[in-house]
Regions:
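FAD-binding core/adjacent interface of flavoenzyme oxidoreductases
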Residues: 1-5, 72-161
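Beta1-alpha1 glycine-rich phosphate/pyrophosphate-binding loop at the start
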Residues: 2-73, 150-162
Length: 162
């Protein structure tokens, strides 16, 4: 059988686990290629702990390469377009095609979707946001707190309940 190529788009938890499991299960001749824009992997589930001072940023971040199994290829690039039928991906590093395509790009908050969000709302979906939330919690003297989900999908579905 000819060697196959699997393209994994995204180096978050979903992409990382998928790529590492594929590398473990596939024939050694098959290629597993992760395409990710960030050099470092941020374990986003720990942003809550960062926000409340139970972790430091250096404890929840690692070079992505260190987390990939030996034999998993890494392409540092932004994904520009995806043609799922052709299993073709256009990136800032060129065009890639594969025999299979895994899309694990995650969700990004659209802070402009809700008027006034940028001016008054806080979220902990980034280290900077977690730090801003920590500051607000530290100075909070009581009153009402509104927890809102503006639209689906959103990062970390359990977050509003935590």
């Amino acid at each position: 059988m000819a060697a196959r190529t699997v393209l994994v788009l995204g180096g978050g938890v979903g992409g990382l686990v998928t790529a590492n499991e594929l590398r473990r299960r596939l024939d050694p001749a098959d290629r597993v290629v992760v395409i990710e824009r960030e050099r470092r992997h941020l374990f986003q589930a720990s942003l809550l702990w960062l926000m409340v001072g139970r972790r430091r940023r250096d404890q929840i971040e690692r070079p992505l390469r260190e987390l990939l199994a030996p034999g998993v290829e890494l392409v540092e690039a932004d994904v520009r377009s995806i043609d799922p039928a052709a299993r073709r991906v256009e990136t800032t590093a060129g065009v890639f095609t594969g025999d299979a395509l895994v899309v694990a790009l995650g969700a990004e908050p659209d802070r402009d979707a809700v008027p006034g969000y940028r001016e008054v709302a806080l979220d902990f979906f980034s280290p900077e946001g977690a730090a801003a939330c920590a500051g607000a919690l530290h100075t909070f003297g009581g009153g009402r707190v509104v927890v809102a989900v503006a639209a689906l999908p959103y990062k970390c579905p359990a977050a509003p309940y935590e």
